[in-house]
Amino acid sequence: MAPSRRQISGRSPLVNQQRQITSFFGKSASSSSSPSPSPSPSLSNKKTPKSNNPNPKSPSPSPSPPKKTPKLNPNPSSNLPARSPSPGPDTPSPVQSKFKKPLLVIGQTPSPPQSVVITYGDEVVGKQVRVYWPLDKKWYDGSVTFYDKGEGKHVVEYEDGEEESLDLGKEKTEWVVGEKSGDRFNRLKRGASALRKVVTDSDDDVEMGNVEEDKSDGDDSSDEDWGKNVGKEVCESEEDDVELVDENEMDEEELVEEKDEETSKVNRVSKTDSRKRKTSEVTKSGGEKKSKTDTGTILKGFKASVVEPAKKIGQADRVVKGLEDNVLDGDALARFGARDSEKFRFLGVDRRDAKRRRPTDENYDPRTLYLPPDFVKKLTGGQRQWWEFKAKHMDKVVFFKMGKFYELFEMDAHVGAKELDIQYMKGEQPHCGFPEKNFSVNIEKLVRKGYRVLVVEQTETPDQLEQRRKETGSKDKVVKREVCAVVTKGTLTDGEMLLTNPDASYLMALTEGGESLTNPTAEHNFGVCLVDVATQKIILGQFKDDQDCSALSCLLSEMRPVEIIKPAKVLSYATERTIVRQTRNPLVNNLVPLSEFWDSEKTIYEVGIIYKRINCQPSSAYSSEGKILGDGSSFLPKMLSELATEDKNGSLALSALGGAIYYLRQAFLDESLLRFAKFESLPYCDFSNVNEKQHMVLDAAALENLEIFENSRNGGYSGTLYAQLNQCITASGKRLLKTWLARPLYNTELIKERQDAVAILRGENLPYSLEFRKSLSRLPDMERLIARMFSSIEASGRNGDKVVLYEDTAKKQVQEFISTLRGCETMAEACSSLRAILKHDTSRRLLHLLTPGQSLPNISSSIKYFKDAFDWVEAHNSGRVIPHEGADEEYDCACKTVEEFESSLKKHLKEQRKLLGDASINYVTVGKDEYLLEVPESLSGSVPHDYELCSSKKGVSRYWTPTIKKLLKELSQAKSEKESALKSISQRLIGRFCEHQEKWRQLVSATAELDVLISLAFASDSYEGVRCRPVISGSTSDGVPHLSATGLGHPVLRGDSLGRGSFVPNNVKIGGAEKASFILLTGPNMGGKSTLLRQVCLAVILAQIGADVPAETFEVSPVDKICVRMGAKDHIMAGQSTFLTELSETAVMLTSATRNSLVVLDELGRGTATSDGQAIAESVLEHFIEKVQCRGFFSTHYHRLSVDYQTNPKVSLCHMACQIGEGIGGVEEVTFLYRLTPGACPKSYGVNVARLAGLPDYVLQRAVIKSQEFEALYGKNHRKTDHKLAAMIKQIISSVASDSDYSASKDSLCELHSMANTFLRLTN
């Protein structure tokens, strides 16, 4: 049997005579296949595979192909509707009798018995045949085109162009004699023009609308009259009309009538459409045969820009990956490759931007595309509309709204098929789509993978289009569409898109000024703007940085921006290299300086206009030059006003803000963001004045080497300090914890306040903490939800009034609003219940956090207002807010008016009862007619002459009086006003909610801090071994910083995870009175040196964020910065070797470390010659000991350093203890004790590590011998050199002292210099 074929997503014109949406990009007639008429009226022309495979989605095994490959149709999925099956003899087609020349069926070929073999040969080639598909229970028409004698199989080409290799003797077939389908087509084609004239003249709804109705069946998007195209496309439209006649055999009047009826229904839903869409999105492409093509240029999809290293020094350009990223392959290549390469040369070798610049032009803009006029002329209106959007946004995937579906065409369809797993629709043009309800899911998938998405929405309905054409005389046949959103990693705002990722997604705008742009050795001046769109937070700052961009590296490592905005070709090479090195594949946007990336003056002007519009300020406060006049800056936020008055000190920060606002304006987020933006100052990161900071500095190297947020395995959270401490229950708490870890406290009093709070939240108060966590456990991300409420009152982007959406967005908004109110109420109640702990213990920080009116706002009155305003449960269920009386003045007034008219109608009823003398007269409603006065038939003679008879039935008549008609008109208008007020009530209530924005944000902030404090209290329970509250003390009386730990464990590593029993704690003491400030640490490889260094650093961080430390005792004077040089790695993307990377990090430490810093150097000097490495290591160590005089650890395998510093009181020699045993072949076996022990270790025992690594025994034994030889040589040369040096030094001293022979002493000094070099060389 033939392989399963992908089901065809066709629809029968009997259900809807409109063509598929694939005709939106219909090909010209010259390239289209001749359509074959179909006699079937079936609702869906989907062919089920003939195979008996019980799972129709799983194709049956394909038969062996014939030796001669049949010529396949290069366009198996043309624009023509899928073929309709021919009915079997027992189920004749309802339209079959309408053919003027009925076909002659030469008998049905039954399935032959197994003992009978029917064979066919060349005699049936060219004949018409019908093949029965058992699972479809239908017949399909085709013709035999080829016979393979070797296989004994015939190739049958069906009417839709698909081919199948069959053994006709084993198939159920019918042989057809009579009029060929081609003749039938030609006969029908003669009547096409007349039909088309009737259809288009009688109904102005255009073919584009037909396309969209076919998909949504409730959209009526009325787009394009494809028949009125130029050249060959007219012929195509005529042929399409012929298909309608052949498949429907309907009278022209019936066609027009049905079309008119369908286009009048805007919200109709089609079951057939659902089946079609389900097939195109869910089912996989089966055995559909595709023609293969040797195409040279293939259109690719669009991937996001990524940061790549500059190709050479001074080159700041970055490669924008666009068309080259998603290469067609497999079926897509065979199906679309040839067409794409032939039709779109302007996307390949003839590529130009909108200003007709070639890619080789230095000002070439890859975001835009020049469309050749000849190409544009051949486009229909709908096609032209799509290409106009695409040509301006070539770096984005276009979600093009057509009815209830978002469509992806051409190169964007390849992205949808690849990344969203959406199947291509039928047709030669790449095309796929998905329903409106899947918008959030699909757009998040693309954005998370690094794509930019342009959302094009309909802003006009078909009825509005028709009305516009009548009123203005416009000839437009396409509904209006507008760009309503640009969604990227940094502009995700929808709650559904952010549910799985509580981390802040920062969009970072960065600019640079000063001498560093021309002088590589000069210091850098940066302006930075960080925007978290989801929480409406804007962080602004300007700072100076060293030539290695250390502060910028720290900022990038902490914030990890997902998107970067920078002025094109402005940043220095060092800055570009830092971005490459310290980011994780962000989306990079290069804006044109000044026109797109604004300077400070332009920024103040543009932002000022926005705030003036928000505050309803008159525009006259600005001069024609765009400068603020008088006190025009008073409406700006305080922070922006201060930056504007600082002149040069704030100009770069304002410029960065300008770049961010311009970018957000393209995404329709600028005004909604600024309206309720929360401005913050950039955390101080100038390392030269670190003592002015309120926080400890953890630079990029420390964050990475200590694995604070990212592990070294895969960059995830597992095994990091953040993962260990993160037991937060709220999303805002998780984000706050990351901030605390990135910037631990430096102020002693603030640290103690946190420690007090953490201590109180456990122990006997643990039940209160658990209850607090339980209350918050089901809350959504309240910080983002509140921000979304703030932005929802701005009718812009997809929230715009003109946007045509079929999803009930109003109901969704009401439900989110109620969720926000309930969340705020829950947070307030949780904080209130936690206040009970203050009765037992006191903590300044907790008292401040839990006292209403201080950090905790008093929101009880606000919550009561909204509870009294409407029923939350009813509103959440219905999606409509019905306000209680007194909640909304406008609605109350409308209700009162309605009641007045209803009261007047009741009064009028009483009057009529009295007039006619019958109390049984009453109002009734019949159909849409209300307030019909129902009068008994016996009183018909007494009815006044001005009564209007509306209807009657046996025994009664129904009337309208003039008064009733007048009151009904007024009542209808009053009800309309009431409904209008009801529709806007939710927006007014949200507006009142936004009036208290500071309260809601304070509530979230207080709740988040309490959540983090409880998390720190709980996290200490997971430590292995004991824990203690660290003692934070000032320096000793002589001003020497100190650190002391007893029984210090590791906060992250546990013995059970290591699989070696319990973790070995250690005692550490550095600094303080009469104590060495540095530990020179030696020991065997794998002895635990690096682990000890890390655990000390992590313990200091824990102590200064207010958490407990895994130790018996821990005391430290505050550390202002932790400087870490640890691990071996290179930065190839930044052009740095391992050794250069180590020295670069060390250079930063040398220039930035202070007396209060903690310096950790792990095996500095490796990666180069031993002499060079040891010389550098000793020089660096000496600098920290003698010049900086800070606390620190220096681990090394240069054992000569231990000899040199064994008498230095500022250095404590220690090693990681081990036991040595004799192994096989003289190889020493080392047992690691992991205990910090005083004294130096004589060896590193590297051969033991080689043994553990599994090196062969003969290699190990040879290594032992070589090791002994090197040690013997070192000892001999060492003793020999010492004797020679001693003799020479005595000679020099004697010679210089006597001063008798200057030339001799000079020669002696030269010899001493030579001997010193020899000594250094031999001792290494």
Swiss-Prot record:
The keyword Calcium does not apply. It holds the Pfam family MutS_IV. Residues 225-235, 262-273 have a biased composition (Basic and acidic residues). InterPro entries: DNA_mismatch_repair_MutS-lik_N (IPR007695), DNA_mismatch_repair_MutS/MSH (IPR017261), DNA_mismatch_repair_MutS_C (IPR000432), DNA_mismatch_repair_MutS_clamp (IPR007861), DNA_mismatch_repair_MutS_core (IPR007696), DNA_mismatch_repair_MutS_N (IPR016151), DNA_mismatch_repair_MutS_sf (IPR036187), DNA_mmatch_repair_MutS_con_dom (IPR007860). ATP binds at G1083, P1084, N1085, M1086, G1087, G1088, K1089, S1090. Gene3D superfamilies: 1.10.1420.10, 2.30.30.140, DNA repair protein MutS, domain I, MutS, connector domain, P-loop containing nucleotide triphosphate hydrolases. Heterodimer consisting of MSH2-MSH6 (MutS alpha). This is DNA mismatch repair protein MSH6. It comes from Arabidopsis thaliana (Mouse-ear cress).
